[in-house]
Structures are given as C-alpha cells and as structure tokens.
C-alpha cells in the first residue's frame, strides 16, 4: 500500500507525502513497479523539479549512461530537470544510505575486511571471502573444497578470463547487483556460464534485449553501462547468506533444518574464524559479518581489549563468551547479521529489541518494531508507543499514533493515555520550545489525513472534539 502511495505521490508531485513515506514509513526510494519504473522516473516524466531534487538527495539512482539514467533524462518534462539529473553527482557516499545491508556487502567487497582468499587475475588482485563465495555459488563451493582447498592465493591466468568481468562477477555474488560496460558483457556472460550462474546469465540476456529495444526506439540515447539489479523483495541473496547462519548454529538448535547444502563440519566448510559461546551453546561465525554489521562486535573482536579465550585445539577459531543473552535470542541476532532478516514472533520482539540496542544493530531494531506493530490494540498501544519512544523507532511511533487516531474516542477514557499526554506536555514545557504537544499533534495529523470524503468530515470532527475535551479537562490548551 505504501509503495503504491509513493508512485502516486511522485506522479502528483506531492513532496510532503513523499518525504513522509520515505522518512517515516521507510519505503525504499528505488523500488520498481510492474512497468520497471522508479519513483524518480515518474517525478521526471511529470515535471516535478523540486521532487526530483529531493529524491536525488535521498538516494534515488540516476547513473549516467545507464538504462535508468538515460530513461529519466529522455522522459524528463523540462530542461531544468534534465540539468538537475546531469549536474547531480553520483549518489553514493554523499547521500543518506537507506539500505544498510547492501552498503555493508558493498564495503565488504571493496575493502576485503577479514578476507581469507585472494584471486589474482592476470596480475590484478581481488580479495574475497570463502564463506560468501561458497554460499552464493555451487561452482565456487566445489572449487574451494577441491582444487583451491587450503590456498590463500588463487592465480587465474586463462586468457578468456577478463579481470573487469571477474570483478563484476564478484560484485554480483556479494551484492546481487552487477555494473558492467557494454564492451565487457560477452566476457561476463562467459564467466557466468563457467560458474554455472544461470540466473545471472538469464538476467544479462534479458537486460541486453531491453537496452537494445530502448536505444532503437529513443534516438540520441547512449547506454554504455549495463546494470543488473535484483527485483523488489528478491529473496535469493538473503536466502543464500542465511545458509551461513544455518551452518553457524550449534547442532542442538538446528531443529528441522534438515540436510544443509554444505554440511558442517563435514564436506564443504563455511570456514568460520570466530566462535561465540552463549550459555552452553557454541556458534561458529565469521568476523567479516559481525564486525561489518555491528560497531559493538567490531570493538569486541578487533580492538585490543577484546575478551577472547584461547582456542580449545590448534586450528580451531578463538572463542568469545557473550553474557546476558540466551541462545534463542542470539539465534535471531545471528540470522539478522547474515541475512538482514529473522522470523521474529511478537512475544520475543521486546527481548530481541533490547539486545539489538545493546549490540548497536539499528536494522534489527526496526525489524523488532515491525513485529511489535502486530500487537497494536486499545489495551497495548500506549505501552508500545512508549517502547517506540524509548528506542527511537520513528516508524513504530508513527504507526502507534496512527492507530491512536482511529480509536481516540475510547483512548481518552484510559488513564494510561491521559498520563502519556501529561508526560509529553511536561517534557515540552521543560524545553520551552513550543506550545504544542508532539503526541497530540501527531494524532491530529492522522485524524485529518483520513478525511477523503464529505461523510468522513463529521467523524473526524467528532474524534477531534473528544481529544480537545480531554485536553481541556486536564488543563492543557494547545
């Protein structure tokens, strides 16, 4: 629903609504519809310059000489929009990153943090991680367990292996995304076939066909870079990374996982380099993921004051004992760290939220917020709202006030809601910033935003009167 609202708002040029959807509802700025179009494309097509600039500043992609970039330029309704697209520097580090998981994987690829293998392709080195290559590709899993087993440096001299194409292939394995110059597409297709990456091969062929049709139908366009991106909500990358979490689980917690694609510890090893001991359970993990995803674990594992125990035997990974957490709760942390997702039942959400806050995992906190949102009822909404405020979960807080607006006539009779309004008013008075009360303002906003027909006006007025009567009764005028 929020995604459809975003596309409609971009066509209308409603900057305020788009800002609300991106910043409060956490909608992805580069989402695509069934016509393979992005919010930025519709803003350009409909001539909304202010909205175009806002989207660019908030992470909308518009790389020069790519299919999406050329499409936005060609479809732009006005010259000022075309100039904004051409003048705007590539949105990477300068913008507010929205996909922290994608950002982490990109850094892992570019910086090679805690890498354990180096590929040298015609003299050009590529640092990589055995665990990721094995999880993402059966071909790499087999080669790392046979021909390349035990090697920290793998030299590839075959004349048909292009270093540029190999780098693009690694980008795909790490991020699910691929950027390649059109002159290297055939080299990339050859490598994809050799590595048995059939999905990538199909995507490359489909993209080449789409770009050819676009260039032929739009004179003056020039596509020099081919970009492959996973479709919205594509589970392949995260599902592959979740296999590493499966391997990290101690045997007593694997339950009904069944046979793993590369059983641990026999057969192909996920090559763990750190062991977390939680109560009586041992999780065999990878520093690259935990240090890259969490400043807490980076300080614990990389800094000089780490509290590691000696390995039990030569060749075993070092052991770090974690306190004040149960194996069940750590399992949710584990799957989030590897795959950016965990199946989180609402009854565990608060416990996981507390741990996510301690381990400095903001994305896991947001997942907990989504789970807590399932608990919204008249009896619980104030308590959930307090949790959202405490842990700074803006989206959950907004969902709470939206729900409060729907049931405000009943809430005004509840003591916990009245107390929440008093506390908000007291906090504002202490700061002396404004006469309004944030909680009350948010409820008023949601009451007003639901009014779309004349029949809804009377209901909204009745809801607002109930709120105003409460404020008067407790001596607040705002």
UniProtKB/Swiss-Prot annotation:
MF (Gene Ontology): translation elongation factor activity
Cellular component terms per the entry's GO annotation: cytoplasm; ubiquitin ligase complex
Positions annotated as ANK repeat: 1-31, 35-64
Gene3D superfamilies (alphabetical): Ankyrin repeat-containing domain, Potassium Channel Kv1.1, Chain A
SUPFAM superfamilies per the UniProt record, alphabetical: Ankyrin repeat (SSF48403), POZ domain (SSF54695)
Coiled-coil residue windows: 450-478
Compartment(s): Cytoplasm
Chain's role: May act as a mediator of the PTEN growth-suppressive signaling pathway. May play a role in developmental processes.
Protein name in UniProt: Ankyrin repeat and BTB/POZ domain-containing protein 1
């Amino acid at each position: 629903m929020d995604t459809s609202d975003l596309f409609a708002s971009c066509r209308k040029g409603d900057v305020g609504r788009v800002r609300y959807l991106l910043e409060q509802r956490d909608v992805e700025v580069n989402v695509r519809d069934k016509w393979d179009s992005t919010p930025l494309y519709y803003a350009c097509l409909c001539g909304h310059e202010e909205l175009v600039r806002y989207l660019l500043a908030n992470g909308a992609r518009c790389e020069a000489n790519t299919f999406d970039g050329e499409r936005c330029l060609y479809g732009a309704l006005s010259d000022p929009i075309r100039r904004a697209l051409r003048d705007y520097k590539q949105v990477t580090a300068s913008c507010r990153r929205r996909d922290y998981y994608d950002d982490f994987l990109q850094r892992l690829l570019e910086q090679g943090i805690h890498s354990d293998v180096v590929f040298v392709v015609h003299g050009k080195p590529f640092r990589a991680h055995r665990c990721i290559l094995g999880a993402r590709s059966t071909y790499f899993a087999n080669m790392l367990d046979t021909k390349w087993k035990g090697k920290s440096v793998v030299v590839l001299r075959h004349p048909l292996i292009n270093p540029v194409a190999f780098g693009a292939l690694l980008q795909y394995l790490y991020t699910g995304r691929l950027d390649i110059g059109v002159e290297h597409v055939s080299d990339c297709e050859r490598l994809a076939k050799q590595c048995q990456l059939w999905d990538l091969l199909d995507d490359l062929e489909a993209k080449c066909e789409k770009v050819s049709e676009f260039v032929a139908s739009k004179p003056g366009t020039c596509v020099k870079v081919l970009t492959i991106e996973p479709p919205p909500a594509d589970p392949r990358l995260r599902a592959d990374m979740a296999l590493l979490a499966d391997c990290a689980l101690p045997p007593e917690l694997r339950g009904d996982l069944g046979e793993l694609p590369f059983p641990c510890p026999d057969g192909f090893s996920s090559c763990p380099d750190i062991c977390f001991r939680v109560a009586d359970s041992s999780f065999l993990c990878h520093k690259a993921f935990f240090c890259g995803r969490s400043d807490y674990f980076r300080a614990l594992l990389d800094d000089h004051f780490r509290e590691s125990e000696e390995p039990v035997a030569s060749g075993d990974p070092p052991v770090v004992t974690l306190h004040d957490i149960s194996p069940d709760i750590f399992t949710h942390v584990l799957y989030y760290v590897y795959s950016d997702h965990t199946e989180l039942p609402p009854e565990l959400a608060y416990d996981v939220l507390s741990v996510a806050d301690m381990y400095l995992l903001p994305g896991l906190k947001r997942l907990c917020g989504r789970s807590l949102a399932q608990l919204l009822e008249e009896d619980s909404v104030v308590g959930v709202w307090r949790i959202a405020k405490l842990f700074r979960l803006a989206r959950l807080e907004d969902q709470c006030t939206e729900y409060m607006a729907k049931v405000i006539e009943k809430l005004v009779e509840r003591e916990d809601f009245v107390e929440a309004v008093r506390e908000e008013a007291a906090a504002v008075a202490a700061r002396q910033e404004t006469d309004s009360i944030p909680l009350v303002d948010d409820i008023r906003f949601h009451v007003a935003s639901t009014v779309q027909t004349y029949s809804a006006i009377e209901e909204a007025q009745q809801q607002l009167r109930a709120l105003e009567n409460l404020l008067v009764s407790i001596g607040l005028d705002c």
